[in-house]
Amino acid sequence: EEADALTGTSIRSSPISGNIMAAAPNLRIVAKASIGVDDVDVEAATKQGVLVTNSPLESNWSAVAEGTMSMILSLLKKTRERDEAMKRGEWRDPVLQGTFLGNRQDGYKGLTIGMIGFGRTARRFTDLLAPWRVRIIAYDPYIEPSRFVLSNVTRVDLTTLLKESDIVSLHVTLTKETRQMIGVEEIGLMKQTAILINTSRGQVVNEKALIDALQN
C-alpha cells in the first residue's frame, strides 16, 4: 500500500494486475528491468496514471540474439547428440553428421533464415549471421523499409516467410496481436524439415498445434 514504485526483471509468476496497482494509491511507476511488459496490465496502469517502463538495453537484446545463434548451431551441428555419444563411446556413429538444409555448396550458403519481427534483437542476429552468407528474409509490418535495406535483408509477407524458410526465428514481444500467432495454419505452411526457434514469449506459439505437428 505504501509503494511509490514497483520493479522487477521477470514477474510473470506474479503479474502486476490492475487490482495490485489499485491497492497501492501512491504508486507512480512500474519499471521492468527487461524488455517485455506483457506481465503488466498496461491498460489498467494508463487509467490509473501509473507509468510503465522497460529496459531495452543492449545487454538484454544482444544476449537473446546470441542465444538464438547458439540454438541454431546446436541443432544444425547436433551438439547435444554428439556430446552424449562421445560419453557413450559412440563418437563415430554416422547419424551424428551435421544437419545440412537447403543446397549445401559452401558452409550454410543455401540456407534461408526467416525472422518474424525485425527489431533490435533480430537486427543483431542478422549481424551475427553475416559470415554465413545465408539468405535472410524478415516479416515486420511496423518497421520502416529502410531498416531491411540497411541490413541487407529481404522484406516479405508472413506467408512467404513461412513457406520459404529453412529456419524460422521469432523475435516479437507478446501482445494481443502476437499471442498464438504461430498456430495450425502457420505451422502447416512451413517446410517439413524446417526448424522453429522461439526466443520470444512461449505464448507466441500455439503449443498444442506445435506438438501435433511434431507427432504427426
Residue spans for each PLM region:
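Rossmann-like adenosine-cofactor binding region
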Residues: 17-21, 137, 141-216
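An N-terminal-biased, well-structured beta-alpha scaffold segment characteristic
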Residues: 1-57, 163, 183
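N-terminal glycine-/charge-rich "phosphate-binding" loop or analogous flexible N-terminal tail
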Residues: 1-6, 133-135, 146
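N-terminal Rossmann-fold NAD(P) dinucleotide-binding loop
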Residues: 122-123
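Gly/Ala-rich phosphate-binding loop of Rossmann-like dinucleotide-binding domains
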Residues: 126, 130, 214
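Glycine-rich Rossmann-fold phosphate-binding loop(s) that bind the pyrophosphate
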Residues: 118-119
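Phosphate-binding beta-alpha-beta segment of Rossmann-like dinucleotide-binding domains, i.e.
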Residues: 56-112, 127
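Phosphate-coordination loops involved in phosphoryl transfer and adenosine-cofactor binding
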Residues: 27, 109-112, 184, 193
